[in-house]
Amino acid sequence: MYNHQNKNFILKKYSHLINKKFSSFGMKKYPRREEIGGDYCLFKYLYIPGIKAYNLGDYIQTIATRSLIELIDKNAKFHFYNRDSFSLYNKKESICIMQGWFADDYNFLPNERIFPVYIGTHFTKKMQEYFDVLNVDFKDFEIGCRDLSTLDYFNKKGANAYFSRCLTLTLPKREVSAKQNSIFLVNLNHEMSSLLPDFIKKEAIEINQKAIKIKNRNLKNEWQECYKEAQDILEKYASEAKLVITTALHCAAPCIALGIPVILLQEDKVYEDRFSALKGILKPYTFNDLKDNRIDFEPKILDIEFLKEMMIKNLKLTLKKHMFTLNKDEEKELNSIRNKIAHFE
């Protein structure tokens, strides 16, 4: 939590930036799509030099966002920019779907050249405290929240907040194949793995998608290798998996979308809210469930095709709303769609 000294320090250091940094939060009028040429900015991630492993979940979100945009805008053009330095963005004016986790500091805030659409967004407690210190007014702010804690925070702030879930749930369902006969354990710790039934352990292949090692270290282009690794891991799940057991949200959600049976294990209480993106879809098991043999190791494929349809329509109509081209009937439809997304089960 911020103490009194920290609050004064932040206000002194950043108060002159408040208007500029938060100018893109509200429902400012975006150019029509034709005026920005159908340009969309997607997130890439520049990790701290010296770190030798990377979380593919970041790029799985980028892949899902791109896939969804391509469904609703056949003429979309894409470029990539570092998520954590949007305040410095200096490229062509573009729309950015703000699907993701924010953030370690204020530099993620889009400047006037980015037209942010907040769908699938999570704000950390640190950023919520930062907003509180700066007393940000969110009355004109619309946000589609990835999780329930972000939703609760912005509802209390008087924002137009709704539960959008995570866009990784919109990936297209795979074709069924006889080659889909592998069991993947994704980011399970040793204690969890040791408690699995013998028939699972005998067949299982362990994967760590949160710590992928980059083969060719090149700070300028390494994000492209990460992106390709994320594409490859999704293809591996789609073409080979008969069951995925994981502790990772951005493994569970895309695998559910692909039509793979999933078992989600919750490492601790911290993950309970993180997994609220899957509320009504898949309930996570706890460590005690695993220890006490309360897990169904033959889960069914979950049918979320209706939810995908609603999430696709939500993005399409939300873009129209931000461009002020939404008519009254579409406004009613959008509200109905968001309600269906929030209460899907």
Language-model regions, residue ranges each:
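Active-site anion-handling motifs in enzyme catalytic cores
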Residues: 2-345
